Amino acid sequence: MAIINPDIRITAAARFDTEAAVGNKILKQTLQQQSGTDARRLSRLSLIAALGAGLLRGQGEIRPDCAVFLGTPFSSPSVFEKMADNVLNHHAAMPFDFIANLHNAPVFHAAKTLGTHGATLAVATERHLETRFHPLLLAAQSLPNGGQAAVGWAYEHQATHADTREGSIWILLEHGAEHGVPVTLGGQTQKAERPSRQEAAHSETQGYYWQDVADWVEELGRRDNSAAAGTWTLDTRKAEHEKDRITVKKSAI
């Protein structure tokens, strides 16, 4: 298996948790207090992504050209549900709501909260084995010399996963950094398999859609670890020095 060492380190991490019972008004007020962002027109998914990004901003120096990659299984479900109800039950066309949710809105608002004007990309992904780490893989493969990239995973409540909490997880990648957890890329001989139904059901009971990603972030620097991303693996090593360990900044509403 070929191993590529791109001289990239994870230097910061953050996690924001909430749940469907928490109203949008509270999330908007929290974001306003945290970053001064005018959140009046933000979707719930954008609020969740931006609140997590704001925590990451407090963990390290974010440069103006920092890129932002965000993985999410869908655009804002609540906006789409409202739009579908208006169209199907009230026969009211909602073209602007439809168009407004087919773009990078959540990652754009996360970048605004981070204070960066770098490249942004929303990656359609699920918690299944072959897609969940695609945002990190894309960021690692596209990071220029001396560059930065904030990589996040956001989730807004969906009826199909009734017991899962909402939230967003973020890490900061830096090329050429002196401290942090190194990331290496390894090629696999075959594509990783999807988890079994039993494994998926177990993940459902863990209470968080991105639970496996959250566990991986918690273990950064604590032990050797490997994350599968399609035909690649993203490998991290146990930190040999205290300065290289990652502490995840957390907040919950």
Regions inferred by a protein language model and the residue ranges of each:
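Conserved "HGTGT" condensation-loop signature of ketosynthase/thiolase-family condensing enzymes
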Residues: 1-97, 101-133, 141-147, 152-253
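Aromatic- and glycine-enriched pocket-lining scaffold segments that form the walls
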Residues: 138
